[in-house]
Amino acid sequence: MQDRNLIDVNLTSEMKTSFIDYAMSVIVARALPDVRDGLKPVHRRILYGMNELGVTPDKPHKKSARITGDVMGKYHPHGDSSIYEAMVRMAQWWSYRHMLVDGHGNFGSMDGDGAAAQRYTEARMSKIALELLRDINKNTVNFQDNYDGSEREPVVLPARFPNLLVNGATGIAVGMATNIPPHNLAESIDAVKMVMEHPDCTTRELMEVIPGPDFPTGALVMGRSGIHRAYDTGKGSIVLRSRTEIETTQTGRERIVVTEFPYGVNKTKVHEHIVRLAQEKRLEGITAVRDESSREGVRFVIEIRREASATVILNNLFKLTSLQTNFSFNMLAIENGVPKILSLRQIIDNYISYQKEVIIRRTRFDKDKAEARAHILEGLLIALDHLDEVIAIIRNSETDVIAQTELMSRFDLSERQSQAILDMRLRRLTGLERDKIQSEYDDLLALIADLSDILAKPERIITIIKEEMDEIKRKYANPRRTELMVGEVLSLEDEDLIEEEDVLITLSNKGYIKRLAQDEFRAQKRGGRGVQGTGVNNDDFVRELVSTSTHDTLLFFTNFGRVYRLKAYEIPEYGRTAKGLPIVNLLKLEDGETIQTIINARKEETAGKSFFFTTKQGIVKRTEVSEFNNIRQNGLRALKLKEGDQLINVLLTSGQDDIIIGTHSGYSVRFNEASIRNMGRSATGVRGVKLREDDRVVGASRIRDNQEVLVITENGFGKRTSATDYPTKGRGGKGIKTANITPKNGQLAGLVTVDGTEDIMVITNKGVIIRTNVANISQTGRATLGVKIMKLDADAKIVTFTLVQPEDSSIAEINTDRENSISKNKDN
């Protein structure tokens, strides 16, 4: 048997209809503000409920639970938590530009702390909130039934100031959202007045009086083009940046102090984010982060390491954290019951139109009230003019109804007038009372004439709106908090914040790197101490020295065939006596990975050039410098190495240079690099020298005929030979003898080309470092034994050596382009 209470419906149709009904309910009745008063229904009901409850600024605070319960029971049946959260937000100085609720107790913080439970807090309306409800009892707005028909509530509040602009709005509806920023009260009122005075004004002209948002938390707005676009179209984006300053402590360290955060930014989350970035090494140079905020204001301190640049770190903080954010305008509001994206001008026009309606309705209400009172007074005056006759009619009437009828008939009075005469007390029959009534009647006639004039003249309505807003401005306006910066925010690179200056980069044999100002280096050079003033220990020495600029890019090639990049300014600056920073703190090197060569990749010097790679197994490769323009933070493969092979060094070449390669068994090969075509980064390369059994490459250099070839053997023998003794041949051969290897002098430790003025630093397998000038080493023929250049212990052997600058040389003599390779043999 079919149940007559069941109705068959199409599921698809029902879903569409029900969802549309739900969506429109959320859009119109919950999530979006009305363009007229700038309030969502929940905020409007809270303020109206508080007003009806008498929780006004001149009365004591009331428990929040009482307020939310009253609002929920009468007007907003959606749960007390949503009502309380909305009320809390209206009481937070960092959320509302002008708070509409005066909270007493814990109402949260801008650190994201929640408010105390509603049973613990108290609230009342703020003074400016009264301006939203002023004249609500004068028929200025329409009322509607509440959800169950037991109460009446306003459809919209009179809103005597442009609240939508002043406090903004945020909300997410179904398929749409609104995000309207707050503005300065005085500027918003001035903008409304400008439109009333100059209806044809443009958005740009409006921005002369309302230049941009004014957030309660202050901060900086970077640039104005985004503001103009948003005001013109209702949609746009601006960049908000924290207000910061860099302080210098008494110890000379720098610290970044944040005093204002962008609107809506959680200070605690920023703190956690910065700490996490520092721990993950994504942000170097920060030693501590403290929140020193108090009742006196926000103070967020970021301590900077002594050698780090606070300006660079601050720039990275803007890039990586919420110290700089984007605020996206989406000025969506309810206009005539329909959600619509509105421009600034449309918001103001709607507000002006609404205020005209409010003033007209209020004026009509006052006029009707005055006319009703004047009507009564007119009857009283008639009665007083015929007092004896009136008294006689009343005395001779059996009932008040008969008396009222007689009075109406005799003096042509209305029912209300006759009733007022009957209700009049005897004391009002005196002559003085008659004068008072006459005076009140005359005043009412003047008032009625004035109110009628207002209704007849639209310009007077405009004047009233302006005068009343000026009074609100005088009482509640305060200075702008958000500063508008001229010019757009640029995506600044760190080097934009670093002064370009000439510097020296040094890398020690043990991997300590630092940056020195060249001026300081020159000063200590004149003192005659040379590179000994570079702060290394007795068991360490400067192995790489590069003259560069703070804006230049340095490439670091490792024995694993990888390349890393650093800007010179990213290398910490130290004094000349300081040791420096372990390079593993700057580059993500793997275990056993060491820097073989540092090359300055300045575009002017590397344009059209190539990198020439040489490996321990005799493989060579030439790759254009342009292949290395984009190097990731964790490095890039520079060449593919075979198993067991290592990169010996990298040379910056012109494409037509001669190259000489030396091997451990004392052979060398010289060839022109043009015989090798340019290859990609992933290529392995070609054979540069054919190695004998158990042989390996120990050095490679660019070579010119006016240079000399310096070789040093494991047992402390060395010699210089003219480059002309090394003929240019094809690559890939076994090479010719460059030294006569015997048990006496030992295998070749390294080969390098020299000009004859350099010093060399030699290190043994015992860690002993010996320094001597190249000129002290004898010149001999190519296939000779060499001469003893240093005395070694019985079990000591030379494992590597490198060229360094002579102690008495000037800065101009430093070999900045690093033509010569560094002889290395660390794997033994």
UniProtKB/Swiss-Prot annotation:
One Pfam family cited in the UniProt record for this chain: DNA_topoisoIV
InterPro entries: GyrA, GyrA/parC_rep, Gyrase/topoIV_suA_C, Topo_IIA-like_dom_sf, Topo_IIA_A/C_ab, Topo_IIA_A_a_sf, Topo_IIA_dom_A, Type_II_DNA_Topoisomerases
Signal peptide: none
EC number from the UniProt entry: 5.6.2.2
GO MF annotations in UniProt: ATP binding; DNA binding; DNA negative supercoiling activity
Topo IIA-type catalytic domain mapped to chain residues: 32-497
Entry's Gene Ontology cellular component terms: chromosome; cytoplasm; DNA topoisomerase type II (double strand cut, ATP-hydrolyzing) complex
Main location, first listed in the record: cytoplasm
Keywords: ATP-binding, Cytoplasm, DNA-binding, Isomerase, Nucleotide-binding, Topoisomerase
Catalytic activity reported: ATP-dependent breakage, passage and rejoining of double-stranded DNA
UniProt-annotated location(s): Cytoplasm
Active site annotation, chain numbering: Y120 (o-(5'-phospho-dna)-tyrosine intermediate)
GO biological process: DNA topological change; DNA-templated DNA replication
Short sequence motif GyrA-box: positions: 524-530
Subunit structure: Heterotetramer, composed of two GyrA and two GyrB chains. In the heterotetramer, GyrA contains the active site tyrosine that forms a transient covalent intermediate with DNA, while GyrB binds cofactors and catalyzes ATP hydrolysis.
Stated family: Belongs to the type II topoisomerase GyrA/ParC subunit family.
Other noteworthy facts: Few gyrases are as efficient as E.coli at forming negative supercoils. Not all organisms have 2 type II topoisomerases; in organisms with a single type II topoisomerase this enzyme also has to decatenate newly replicated chromosomes.
Described purpose of this protein according to its UniProt entry: A type II topoisomerase that negatively supercoils closed circular double-stranded (ds) DNA in an ATP-dependent manner to modulate DNA topology and maintain chromosomes in an underwound state. Negative supercoiling favors strand separation, and DNA replication, transcription, recombination and repair, all of which involve strand separation. Also able to catalyze the interconversion of other topological isomers of dsDNA rings, including catenanes and knotted rings. Type II topoisomerases break and join 2 DNA strands simultaneously in an ATP-dependent manner.
NCBIfam families in the record: gyrA, PRK05560.1, PRK05561.1
Full protein name: DNA gyrase subunit A
Native source organism of the sequence: Streptococcus pyogenes serotype M18 (strain MGAS8232)
Name of the gene this protein is made from: gyrA
